[in-house]
Amino acid sequence: MCLEAGRGLRGLIGCTQPRRIAAHAMADRVAEELGCELGTLVGYQVRFRDRSSPDGYIKFMTDGILLAETVSDRELAAYDTLIIDEAHERSLNIDFLIGYVRQLLARRPELRVIVTSATIDTEKFAAHFGNAPVIEVSGRGHPVEVIYQPLGESTGAERKDRDLYRGIADAVQKLNRVDARGDILVFLSGEREIHEARDYLARQKLRHTEVLPLYARLSHAEQRRVFHPGPERRIILSTNVAETSLTVPRIRFVIDSGLARISRFARPSRGTELLAYSQGRNADGQQ
């Protein structure tokens, strides 16, 4: 839409994503749709990797990359359009960017800013940007049935983890019995939980099933495996990287542990952050 509206000619169309894997995947997809090689007209930049071109039209990046650019380019003159995606995540970087670009618009009225999300309070965000217009884009809707499965009431972290892995295995086995179509996406809070759940499922000797991990620190080749379904049913154990921006093909069932590691201030006076283990947010669950 931005390209059709003539944006990207006087500067880049910059699109932020909350995670590196999402920035890379989005750049891959858009480059494929435009029929160009990644790194030419469409590129991306994440920490330690830059495949963007100043002569291109579209640049995907993490929100941290764009925030870092404000240090050397306070006017963000390289861009004529900025898209802040997944604004409902409300990370520190996203909050800073939303406040910064609002002030920047007063100095650069020709700059266009688009804030996107499936679950934000549109009225509040529109008011924040001076009663900006709200555009609703209808997506493909599918009926979703939510089933709650209580876990055991064990005490102690290790026993609670075992209850969780047993609950996942029970749910998978039940799904295998009632409906063998499609793959299963399982949301867990971190890498350790993913590897432990993978080991637990391996001991169950599930037939005709492939178990794949998905988290930000995986190599690009390992991450790409989830986008290429095979003949067997796949169980994809993922952190919240697959909640937004990424569309994993052939998913029919989702098992959500309801737990996540969320970045929080440990000592606000010193600016220290930690990844706190907590229940997931409502907006993330709705997404």
Spans of features found by a protein language model:
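P-loop NTPase motor module signature
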Residues: 1-287
